[in-house]
A protein has these predicted regions:
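C-terminal catalytic domains of large/alpha subunits in multi-subunit enzymes
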Residues: 1-148
Length: 148
């Protein structure tokens, strides 16, 4: 099993409701990192993809098919969107993996979106339970929160 922890610092513009992810720290139990640079790169790439799911990517389905399957209408993060990333490799050799290693291909996707949702909730005082947390979603949540 994989274990990880993720922390995110965000800034929310109260005029445009845009979320800027300032920093993301991801600590991952990797077993034994046979090639730490590649392991770190895998984790950072997956983390950036997961952050995109949190605030940018909105896959729309229509009649069972993806309706926005083009790069022009399904926004994904680029290098310019990358916040400061810190990756902590927690090395505890895994007795059942090759040379003590664990797979790290999927675990970077698990924590960042929840960490972003929690950070935005901490900043604004209203909870989010669906992704992406777009400016429109933030504006609607703020309106509901202000009315309550």
């Amino acid at each position: 099993y994989g274990w990880a922890a993720c922390l995110v610092d965000v800034e929310v513009d109260l005029d445009s409701y845009e979320i800027q992810i300032l920093r993301c720290v991801q600590a991952v139990d990797v077993g034994k990192a046979i090639n730490p640079a590649i392991v770190r790169g895998q984790i950072e790439g997956g983390t950036l993809q997961a952050l995109g799911w949190a605030v940018l990517e909105n896959v729309v389905y229509k009649e069972g098919k993806v309706a926005n399957a083009n790069m022009t209408n399904c926004i994904v993060p680029t290098f310019a969107d990358a916040p400061e990333l810190e990756t902590i490799l927690v090395e505890v050799p895994y007795p059942y993996g090759p040379s003590g290693a664990k797979g790290v291909g999927e675990i970077p996707m698990d924590g960042p979106a929840a960490a972003v949702a929690n950070a935005v909730e901490d900043a604004l005082g209203c909870a989010f339970d669906a992704l992406p947390i777009s400016p429109e979603v933030v504006a609607a949540a703020r309106s509901r929160w202000e009315l309550s």
